[in-house]
């Protein structure tokens, strides 16, 4: 099966004008635990971290020391297993054009991995999906956390973000990491098999308007709860139209989680300020209720472990 898929993938190289194709572990939301495990689809590798580059005459699978033996067992028949550190400024091949899905990489990743010795070509269609697109999709709605759990309302958190935007003399913040949207709005979801992260993105401006970029059916509860206005819920399919109808200005994007696709899209409308999303730091500072709940969780965990022993 893997050999057949590799052959099908390589058959597309000529059509797209590429010498190889890159497949990361993450999905469009940069999650390691996605329903769409394209790396497993093309390599049979089931570890939580890895990266494949398929060339016309060679297949490379990059993994860290945790997975060296596992990768050999699962993928060694079709792939050369390489230490993950060697992916930086990779010189295993040179002067090639590597195709990739711009939704799956940040511009920093591309510079770090490919551009010293090779060129990249952005391909709008994911080539793995063209040969295998039988992934399960979750359509369960997002839900809000109980006020007794979070300790801080989403309105207070939004005020902190507004202050950050103004301090950086900008007009918008684009929150591309779903876990940061979850923190800001105090919501969770069912999109990933082992994590309650809601797959969505968010834009917020200096006038306290928030625009949730999400599949409509997943966010209906948030409209009922008046966390999001109906007109401010943006289906990803309508994103181009939405951007055309809002004011220009300076927008802050996160260097860790904003994909090349979104960076290119936003650059057409805004002046970009590339900076770390402030929510990473904000959410690391726990409020009193969060600290109390963490202590209680450790107690419950200790009781469960003691009973097991």
Residue ranges, per PLM feature:
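Well-ordered alpha/beta subsegment
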Residues: 100-102
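Acidic, metal-coordinating catalytic cores used for nucleic-acid/nucleotide bond scission
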Residues: 104-106, 257-258
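N-terminal accessory/capping or targeting/presequence segment of soluble
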Residues: 1-92, 105, 109-244, 299-300, ...
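Divalent metal-coordination and catalytic microenvironments
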Residues: 98, 294
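C-terminal helix-coil-helix/basic helical segment that borders enzyme active sites and/or dimer interfaces
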Residues: 306-309
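Terminal amphipathic helices with adjacent charged low-complexity linkers/tails
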Residues: 115-137, 259-293
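Conserved catalytic alpha/beta cores of large enzymes that bind or transform nucleotide phosphates
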Residues: 96, 222-277
């Amino acid at each position: 099966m893997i050999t057949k898929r590799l052959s099908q993938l390589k058959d597309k190289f000529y059509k797209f004008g590429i010498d190889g194709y890159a497949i990361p572990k993450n999905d469009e939301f940069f999650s390691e635990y996605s329903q769409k495990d394209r790396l497993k689809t093309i390599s049979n590798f089931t570890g939580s971290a890895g990266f494949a580059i398929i060339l016309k005459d060679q297949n490379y699978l990059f993994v860290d020391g945790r997975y060296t033996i596992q990768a050999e067992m699962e993928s060694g028949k079709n792939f050369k297993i390489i230490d993950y550190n060697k992916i930086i400024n990779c010189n295993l091949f040179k002067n090639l054009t590597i195709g990739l899905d711009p939704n799956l990489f940040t511009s920093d990743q591309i510079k770090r991995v490919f551009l010293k010795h090779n060129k990249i070509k952005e391909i709008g269609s994911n080539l793995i999906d063209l040969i295998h697109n039988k992934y399960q999709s979750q359509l369960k709605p997002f839900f809000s956390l109980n006020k007794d759990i979070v300790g801080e309302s989403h309105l207070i958190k939004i005020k902190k973000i507004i202050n950050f935007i103004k301090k950086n003399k900008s007009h918008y913040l684009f929150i591309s990491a779903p876990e940061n949207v979850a923190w800001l709005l105090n919501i969770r979801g069912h999109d990933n098999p082992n994590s309650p992260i809601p797959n969505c993105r968010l834009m917020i401006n200096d006038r306290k308007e928030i625009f949730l970029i999400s599949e409509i059916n997943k966010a209906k509860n948030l409209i009922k709860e008046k966390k999001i206005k109906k007109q401010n819920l943006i289906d990803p399919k309508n994103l181009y139209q939405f951007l055309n109808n809002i004011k220009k200005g300076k927008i802050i994007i996160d260097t860790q989680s904003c994909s090349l696709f979104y960076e290119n899209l936003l650059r057409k409308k805004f002046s970009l300020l590339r900076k770390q999303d402030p929510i990473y730091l904000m959410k690391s500072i726990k409020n009193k209720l969060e600290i109390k709940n963490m202590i209680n969780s450790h107690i419950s965990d200790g009781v469960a472990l003691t009973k097991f022993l």
